[in-house]
A protein has these predicted regions:
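Amphipathic alpha-helical segments of the small helical/lid subdomains adjacent to P-loop NTPase cores
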Residues: 1-19
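Accessory nucleic acid-recognition modules appended to NTPase machines
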Residues: 24-182
Length: 183
């Protein structure tokens, strides 16, 4: 019985704070996750790509965390960052998101039924560690669960097109049927 309790407690901590080695044995796990986020990813992205608008980069990561589980287009993300008071161009937003993907901060998943252009420009993004979501969002439990499932699927099935989401062009009506099309 003690073994099950320890496993549940360890999973609960992993679920909330993630599994980065730096935070596992830390006294203040949230601070350790914050340090890892700041040092490894933000500093790596900022230094490697000479990002000058660091506040917009941080806001972009926050908006991605707020949108976990939702398809996120570059236009929508740019608008969300601008509405938060950070001036940013769409091309800059695209670059910042690509930097986050290159640094393995976030992982993209494409819509299987979208056009090729839509697959690249309207994806779902998941953070590589659940602790990062906890840093960027006030009530993250549902998003952390979806993030954890997405990470498991990506690890199990690979980072290619075998993991995707399905979002049809037309959503079903309240009765659960797709609208009929007349030819």
């Amino acid at each position: 019985m003690k073994g099950k309790i320890r496993i549940r407690r360890a999973f609960a901590e992993f679920f909330v704070y993630g599994g980065l080695p730096k935070g596992v044995n830390a006294v203040n796990r949230l601070e350790a996750v914050n340090d890892a986020f700041r040092e490894i990813y933000l500093a790596g992205v900022i230094v490697r790509h000479t990002v000058s608008n660091t506040s917009a980069l941080r806001m972009l990561h926050k908006q991605v965390a707020e949108s976990i589980g939702q398809p996120l287009s570059f236009t929508r993300l740019t608008k969300m960052v601008k509405e938060a008071g950070m001036p940013i161009a769409k091309n800059t937003c695209i670059s910042y998101l690509q930097y986050a993907c290159e640094s393995s901060l976030v992982l993209p998943i494409s819509n299987i039924v979208g056009k090729l252009q839509e697959r690249d420009s309207s994806q779902k993004y998941y953070f590589v560690d659940n602790g990062f979501i906890r840093l960027l969002k006030s009530d993250p439990k549902a998003d952390q669960l979806e993030n954890l499932v997405a990470l498991h699927l990506l690890r199990r099935h690979g980072f290619n097109d075998r993991v995707f989401f399905y979002r049809p062009k037309q959503l079903p009506s309240e009765e659960g049927r797709f609208p009929s099309t007349k030819y």
